[in-house]
């Protein structure tokens, strides 16, 4: 093996298959771009993003780990969210939960 060498799997990988999804319209009402990472608790994102935060509680973006979605100023787009997995405890972010969901 060579350091950094990759051994990709054959075929197509399907992410988060079978997970419940929530679709929300999100608008960036601010004057700067906002970027949200794959595992960020979506309900606690930048206040310039306008959407139903109650529906996003306990959810994250349905995108590949380590990637992000960027919202340009004035942009409106639909996002697909999935429930945060594991023990469903959230700490940090904007400190709006700080414990179990």
From Swiss-Prot:
Q: Where in the cell is it found?
A: Cytoplasm
Q: List the GO cellular component terms.
A: urease complex
Q: What is this enzyme's catalytic activity, as reactions?
A: urea + 2 H2O + H(+) = hydrogencarbonate + 2 NH4(+)
Q: Which Gene Ontology BP annotations are present? A: urea catabolic process
Example of a GO MF term: urease activity
SUPFAM superfamilies (alphabetical):
Urease, beta-subunit
What does the record note on quaternary structure? Answer: Heterotrimer of UreA (gamma), UreB (beta) and UreC (alpha) subunits. Three heterotrimers associate to form the active enzyme.
What is the protein's name according to its record? Urease subunit beta
Give the organism the record lists.
Ruegeria pomeroyi (strain ATCC 700808 / DSM 15171 / DSS-3) (Silicibacter pomeroyi)
């Amino acid at each position: 093996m060579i350091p950094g060498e990759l051994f990709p799997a054959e075929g197509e990988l399907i992410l988060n298959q079978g997970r419940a999804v929530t679709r929300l319209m999100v608008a960036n009402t601010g004057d700067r771009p906002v970027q949200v990472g794959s595992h960020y608790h979506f309900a606690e994102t930048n206040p310039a993003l306008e959407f139903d935060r109650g529906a996003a509680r306990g959810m994250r973006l349905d995108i590949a780990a380590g990637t992000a979605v960027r919202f340009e100023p004035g942009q409106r787009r639909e996002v697909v969210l999935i429930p945060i997995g594991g023990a469903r405890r959230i700490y940090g972010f904007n400190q709006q939960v700080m414990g179990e969901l």
